[in-house]
Amino acid sequence: MQRTKFCTLTRLFNMATGLETVPKMENESEMIGCFPYDEETTDVVIRVDNKRLHLSRGTLMQASPVFRKMLSSNGKENQAEITLPEKSYEEVILFLRCISPREFVKLDEESIDVVLPLAHEYKVKATLQKCEDWLLTEIKFIVGEVTGHTKGTQEKVEFFAKCLLYGTKHDLETLYVRALELLVPYKLSRYQHTKFYKLLPDKPKSQLLETRMVKIEKTNSIVDGHFSEEEEEIGEEGEEIEY
């Protein structure tokens, strides 16, 4: 109990003084991420930045094949402590909260930026799927201009470029295909200088530009934003994006 209070106060102080930035939480209770010792359930410790997080071996091993391997030393499930080097304590806490059955994390764009790379690294399929579903839903809201989700053209294009990058880096096929479809109508100048496009490997860059060129040739129209419905029908005949 004392350890939990100390961790909470320390985090609140750091956040208030600008020493620490973390994704937005819904309320103060969600900021408690110290995973204190529980004599009935704790049987493994994860050490990050010389801080100890007390967790359940079974939960970690069921969620992640990577954790399963780390906790099995020479095929024997006897590892009592594992260290995650070069990881952010705050980011690991948020990630672990996403896979803990006793926690609920309401995802948003900021938290996904943190959680998605870790979920991919540790191969946590359930969390990867949740992140992809959230991003696809957000795309649907943005395209439909749902209140609270509207974005300016440039902001919208950058979000689609981010989704294309995430789909590429984290093997999210549905997200990749949808983001590519949405970027095709826009001119290269809209996104070529964004950090997300610059981080893309050559293959998706080529696919994006080639798909746009094919669409332009089929419709005989150079657009920036969207092709007309008639042009879309002509351009989509027999056309399928490969991942």
Feature annotation, model-predicted:
Residues D202-H226:
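Long, highly charged low-complexity segments enriched in Glu/Asp and Lys/Arg with interspersed Ser/Thr
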Residues E86-E91, G167, D171:
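Short, low-complexity cationic-aromatic patches
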Residues P101-T194:
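Post-BTB helical module
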Residues N50-R52, K76-T83, R97-P101, V114-L116, ...:
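Short interface patches used for recognition in eukaryotic signaling and trafficking proteins
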Residues Q2-T59, E90, L94-I112, G225-E232, ...:
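N-terminal BTB/POZ boundary and linker segment
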Residues D43-Q79, L128-E132:
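Alpha-helical oligomerization interface recognition
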Residues S73-L84, G144-G148, E242-Y243:
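Interdomain boundary/hinge elements
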